[in-house]
Each structure stands twice: as structure tokens, then as C-alpha cells.
Amino acid sequence: MRVVIQRVSKASVTIEENVVGKVGPGFMLLVAFNDEDTDADLDFAVRKIVNMRIFEDEQAKMNLSINDVKGAILSVSQFTLFASTKKGNRPSFTKSGNPELASKLYDQFNAKLRATGIEVQTGQFGADMQVELVNDGPVTIVLDTQNKE
């Protein structure tokens, strides 16, 4: 599982000219799964995202979590995070998860995020989406549950 976490002042996702998800301050998450991901990977990612202290406190130090700032999350599936560019100029997506499994994991991931009490808006799995965001900082962190650094 890979998640690109972006601290945003606002973000939205549009499908066929309809805004389907929109948040103010918080996180924009781009989320991808592979066939080896498990419930433990979902739990690890949710725990890290919810507790990650990357919002500034009164001293301008990154010391606050999304809960502390009462932020919201916009979660968008993006299988291209598992692209391989090893050979040639056209990316390979064979490491991306089976769409049926990935869709199920995406729904479970968002449910686990919501269970923490944080507002979670989403895109639509597999849809062609337009994502708009205003990066705050910018602060962008890549979380990979297979490479826990």
C-alpha cells in the first residue's frame, strides 16, 4: 500500500463536472494498493496518518496532528503510484493491485479512517477524476507499508 499524504489548505475532486468530495484544511491522500496488502497494512497506514504531526503549533513547529487541528481528509485512489519505469518510456502497472481487491481495500481504508472520527471525503474508485488542491507548506510525505521508513 502506498499513500501520498499532502497537507492542504483545501482540496476537491470532480467527476464529470460534479464535485464529489471537498475539504478545507487537512490532508489530500492519493492511495494505491497491491495484491499483497492486508488488513494490517490498512491499520498501520491509518494509525500513521491520523497521528502524524505535520501541522504547525503556535511556535511554527510541526507538532500537531490532523485531529489536533480538526482537519478533514480527501482520499483519492490512484493505482499509478505503483508504476514501474524500469524499462522503456511507458510505465508498467503490473505491480498495482487487482482492481476488485483494490476497490475493497480502498473502501475498508476509508471506513477505518472515518472510524477515528475524522471527516473523510472520497473520489470514486476507478473513475476519471480531476483533483484540485492547494498545498500547504508544501508538506508531502510518501507512506509505503512494505517499506516502513
Swiss-Prot record:
Motif, Gly-cisPro motif, important for rejection of L-amino acids: chain positions: 137-138
Reactions this protein catalyses: glycyl-tRNA(Ala) + H2O = tRNA(Ala) + glycine + H(+); a D-aminoacyl-tRNA + H2O = a tRNA + a D-alpha-amino acid + H(+)
Keyword annotations from UniProtKB, A to Z: Cytoplasm, Hydrolase, RNA-binding, tRNA-binding
HAMAP family to which the protein is assigned, alphabetical: Deacylase_Dtd
GO cellular component, one term: cytoplasm
Annotated gene: dtd
NCBIfam families named among the record's database cross-references: D-aminoacyl-tRNA deacylase
Coiled coil: none
GO biological process entries: D-amino acid catabolic process
Protein name, UniProt field: D-aminoacyl-tRNA deacylase
Gene Ontology MF annotations: D-tyrosyl-tRNA(Tyr) deacylase activity; Gly-tRNA(Ala) deacylase activity; Ser(Gly)-tRNA(Ala) hydrolase activity; tRNA binding
